[in-house]
Amino acid sequence: MKKFKNTMAVLLVLISISNANAIVNYNQSKELNLQVQLVHSLDYSSGIDLADKNLNTVFTNYFLLKDELVKTDGVSAAAKAKLLSASLNKVKMNELNKDVHRVWMKVMKNVMADAKGIAATEDIKSQRVLFVSLSKKMYDLVKVAKYDSAVYYQFCPMANDGKGAHWLSKENAVLNPYYGSKMLKCGEVVETIK
């Protein structure tokens, strides 16, 4: 009789454990299913895939850097360039479409070098020299990648020692990052990229 009671006790414990595991597995399955549904609703309802979101962050950080150069704030420009570098590192090349990937591979090293160079100095003149090169490569990238809104490709004929220089802006209004308040409105929109 004692053996029977012990066997029954062990059997009850095993059944309890089995039921507990089933409940845990069911709850985990429900949670995982909910997470999958959430990911699908985030990725597809917006119409933007993860790679596009990462590139949008890159462009947004470029625009923030440009705004600090407009303000002639070398300290803040260096900080924004660090953000740009960090966002460049987060782009997953294998998630880019073929055309974007081709351009990304062509410009990525130079874009990263320019961003790191701007981040490494607080000298506004040095930052602006690097921004000329950075803007050329970012233009190549924005031409093939989608951004959330229109991008304005702007040009100042006096920048870059009179050779002229371009930059990208989210605003149609010209705010010159190469001269800041000295010649804030110097330049024009030469292309609208949608």
Q: What is the predicted role of each segment?
A:
Residues 13-19:
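Hydrophobic h-region of N-terminal signal peptides that target proteins for export
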Residues 9-11:
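Structured mid-domain segments that build the active-site/substrate or prosthetic-cofactor binding neighborhood
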Residues 2-7, 19-194:
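Intrinsically disordered, low-complexity terminal tails/loops enriched in metal-binding residues
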